[in-house]
Amino acid sequence: MAITIKKITLDKEVDVFDITVPETETFFANGIAVHNCNEIYLSTCKDESFVCNLSSINLERWDDLKDTDAIETLVYFLDSVMTEFIDKTEGMAHMDAPRRFAINQRALGVGVLGWHSYLQSKSLAFESMQAKMENIDIFKTLREKCDSATAQLAQIYGEPELLKGYARRNATTIAVAPTTSSSFILGQVSPSIEPLNSNYFVKDLAKGKFTYKNPYLTKLLKSKALDNTETWRDILIHGGSVQHMTALSDEEKAVFKTFGEIPQKEIVIQAAQRQRYIDQGQSLNLMIAPKAKPKEVNELMIFAWESGVKGLYYQRSANPAQELARSIMTCSTCEA
């Protein structure tokens, strides 16, 4: 029996998503380039289009800056950038909506980078109770200092119309953005709030290829007379991992676990801890094993939602060193 379809009629209009933007973190939605950001939670309406000024604090230097006015100064700086944006867009074509939002809300987003590097500098395992305590202390301090700074700005320069009576200059002050490029430039520290993908890898950037060796692991290996080519090649072949090394103690191995070796539920728990202090969101990535069952992934996402995490960013499955290790250990002439 043969059936011939003569005509297809759509009874409603549907959204079309064309995922065709190469080498960018964007996609087309109904002809509009959309950024898949998860740190920004601001509104857009017919008359306003959100804008937000972002910058990140290097947590590797947290002990040096936590008792200074560095955080407050960063809030002052970002607010002045917002003022400059408002001034420069006056009368500019097609900028009425974002300028109006900037005037009414002056939204800022102070974030962080170098979280895993900070823990490793103190020889703290990502999964440890001490890490959880540091996590809470850092973001509680960040919240208090940002609130103090925006209150001072409101007292000096006044409150936007939308915030009249709230004693605030800015609708938001904290947003944890992804910092893959900036963290690498800023001393090759770990990106944002996530663990390092690998202890040893080659990063291919526009300016060239750069080799990354975990500086805190390097220091440890030097103390054991193991900082040599043979050791690092062994680490590379094992996907940037040190979990196989008999020369390291269990405590030392725990400190240098990579992204995929840390239980992802632990990453969600830390995100939930800090979310209470973040008025916007956090760029939260998860490293899911390729063999993970859909049910397990679903349970992890539900756990994140139930824990108070506002959203998730990327779901990854392999790190750069693992990919390179595969190419090293694979005979290309043996492939079919």
Indicate where each model-derived feature is located.
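Intein-associated homing endonuclease modules of the LAGLIDADG/DOD-type, together
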Residues: 2-36, 185
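Generic recognition of flexible, low-complexity loop/linker segments
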Residues: 4-9, 15-16, 41-42, 101-104, ...
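Structured loops at beta-to-helix junctions and adjacent beta-edge loops in soluble globular domains
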Residues: 20-22, 31-32, 55-57, 177, ...
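Function-dense linear segments that define catalytic or interfacial modules
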Residues: 37-102, 114-118, 189-215, 220, ...
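Conserved active-site and cofactor/substrate-binding residues in soluble primary-metabolism enzymes
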Residues: 49-52, 69-76, 103-113, 133, ...
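Contiguous, well-ordered alpha-helical segments that form the cores/surfaces of helical PPI scaffolds
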Residues: 56, 106-121, 171, 181-184
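Internal maturation/activation junctions in enzymes
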Residues: 71-99, 103, 107, 122-179, ...
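Catalytic alpha/beta core of large soluble enzyme barrels
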Residues: 86-88, 174-325, 329-336
